């Protein structure tokens, strides 16, 4: 019997799944925003901003209190002194992305880190100057890539290679990525693709892409904004050169929080690798000697520029502690597959051809997110999205016509999926042409 065949309609079935869920207790560790009626929102937007851990306020308040009590001495005193504070996040963050010790650091923002990585890893020559990205890449990635191309004196019209879906399709075929790498391999300086595509929710074959790219002499990096904390990653063993990600989505660190960066160990101590430098990347044993010569720390820490914002790191630590307590990505991924499988089944049963799910139907090719388009002649996607918001469902709208729904395994329930689809069904029934 297939898993879909085991699903049943009705709220009792959803509640039964929740009752048997070993991760259900973690929902109470997060603040669920209230809806207008006083009930908790049906929050399905963790792919845009994760919910606040209830412990985050305590973690942040502890650092505010330390500042009040100790002032500058807080850099060196207390359970979590500020000077090495980023190090307290390193082990769990590395585990979540499959990094080895020293390969991961929490710093800056995603796009800032992408620029820092491209300073080191995009070294164009007349023969090899192209960068491969995907069609409909997240705009900030494309802006960064095109600006780097121009900075080096090249034209994106010549140096930007875009792999696209086939006509009439939303997803990009693995074979087409391989074909583009094969055709442009000798002129590609950098492959820069997402781990999970933000618009469609498609998981890319990062191991395969890295292998293909390296076989043709390309540097391979990934934007993991929608992958970190969402799907299992194994960056070190996949031999990825670098990766960047934000922490405010699935990692629940708060709006605009500090981002993450991975640099493979084989690059971490490369003396000849160019970089933009700052004092926080200097060898910590001699940093405060204030010497004139930059001596980088080994590993990803050597790309740090300035001392990080402690209050933001405190909020990240609160969330990472929950990930560790939950057992890391393996149990979360297991629940995520069941959540999205159940949600996909409910949508297909209830709406049929009146919607189009553009996220891959194969569970291993998607993360938490289901992206859908309304295909009904009776109402638009915007009409539906407005109704969902008014009914206490928080999803995510992406132009021109996609609604993204993301049940997150740390705090979403099967009941959330059921209630969302019931609200959708009622709207569909009430707005159908007769």
PLM features per residue range, with description:
Residues 1-434:
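Pyridoxal 5′-phosphate
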